[in-house]
């Protein structure tokens, strides 16, 4: 397992298309943050999805939950913008050096997704997309980040020199695929929690509550599509049950599919997951297109 992670971390994977560095010249020390558009043929008349790969907030599964997803969306007539956001790094997963140094942690990740939403909307005309049909899809920890963008859109974390955003930071829809949700209790995914909050932050009940998605569903939460699998060995399947209940209690339009099999980390693969769980791809496309009929 560790060898596989090391390979994924060290491999140089370059997405196709023009890569943009949204923090360029802004002194955020975030040169590794990149966004790459994958535009459909009729790009101005279809939704756009910002894709957030998973990786426990320590690394990014850039291939299986990033590039392949963006290409799949584009090939199905949906624009994609692949976001490579800041993570704690694989080193922090092994050596716990953030006991001594800040490293990467919250709010770095939500800064990156908000900066991406802002950049894409402000540059929608030159990018060739519709800024009013812009959503976010995330996998595992990326699903937590996608939901965070919906839950905290009224707080501008970007702190740009020109001031608060004049465009909405709220995504128009969210796809949460086998997401991390809660930071509390027996169902919390501890590695993601540590990646997000830091070595000291995990001991703070205030910080755990602050980043537990189920505690922060806003009145204006956009529609949510969510799936996971009962046999998930990585992120306990109750995370999505918790989110489903929170969305239901808040009256948020959403679709939740719980598959019996499929495990975790299958993305849009034709190989990984199960025949049952791979149905999520068609279900998502039907759901998304239904939002704009």
Show which residues each predicted segment covers:
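Mobile cap/lid helix-loop segments that gate and shape the active-site cleft of serine hydrolases
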Residues: 25, 163, 179-216, 222
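N-terminal cap/lid segment of alpha/beta-hydrolase-fold proteins
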Residues: 9-43, 107
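Catalytic nucleophile-loop/oxyanion-hole region of alpha/beta-hydrolase
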Residues: 61-68, 84-131, 272-277
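Primarily recognizes the serine-hydrolase "nucleophile elbow" in alpha/beta-hydrolase
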Residues: 115-189, 208
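Acidic catalytic loop of the alpha/beta-hydrolase fold
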Residues: 183, 231-235
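C-terminal catalytic histidine-bearing segment of alpha/beta-hydrolase fold enzymes
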Residues: 93-96, 227, 237, 241-293
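Short beta-strand/loop motif that positions the catalytic acidic residue
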Residues: 220, 226-228, 232
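Short beta-strand element of the alpha/beta-hydrolase
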Residues: 46-54
């Amino acid at each position: 397992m560790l060898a596989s992670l090391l390979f994924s971390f060290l491999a140089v994977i370059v997405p196709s298309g023009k890569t943009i560095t949204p923090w360029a010249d802004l002194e955020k020390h975030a040169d590794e943050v990149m966004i790459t558009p994958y535009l459909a043929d009729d790009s101005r008349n279809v939704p756009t999805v910002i894709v957030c790969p998973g990786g426990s907030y320590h690394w990014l599964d850039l291939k299986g939950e990033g590039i392949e997803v963006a290409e799949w969306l584009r090939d199905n007539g949906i624009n994609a913008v692949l976001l490579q956001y800041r993570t704690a790094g694989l080193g922090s997963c092994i050596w716990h050096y953030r006991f001594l140094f800040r490293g990467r942690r919250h709010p770095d990740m939500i800064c990156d997704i908000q900066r991406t939403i802002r950049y894409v909307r402000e540059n929608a005309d030159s990018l060739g997309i519709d800024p009013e049909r812009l959503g976010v899809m995330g996998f595992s920890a990326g699903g937590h980040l996608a939901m965070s963008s919906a839950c905290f859109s009224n707080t501008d974390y970007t702190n740009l020199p020109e001031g608060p955003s004049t465009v909405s930071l709220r995504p128009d829809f969210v796809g949460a695929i086998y997401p991390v949700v809660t930071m509390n209790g027996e169902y919390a995914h501890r590695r993601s929690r540590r990646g997000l909050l830091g070595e000291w932050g995990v001991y703070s009940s205030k910080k755990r509550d602050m980043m537990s998605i189920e505690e922060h569903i806003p009145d204006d939460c956009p529609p949510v599509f969510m799936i996971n699998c009962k046999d998930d060995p990585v992120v306990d399947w109750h995370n999505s049950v918790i989110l489903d209940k929170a969305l239901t209690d808040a009256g948020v339009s959403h679709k939740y599919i719980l598959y019996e099999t499929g495990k975790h980390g299958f993305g849009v693969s034709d190989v990984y997951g199960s025949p049952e769980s791979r149905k999520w791809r068609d279900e998502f496309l039907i759901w998304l297109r239904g939002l704009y009929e």
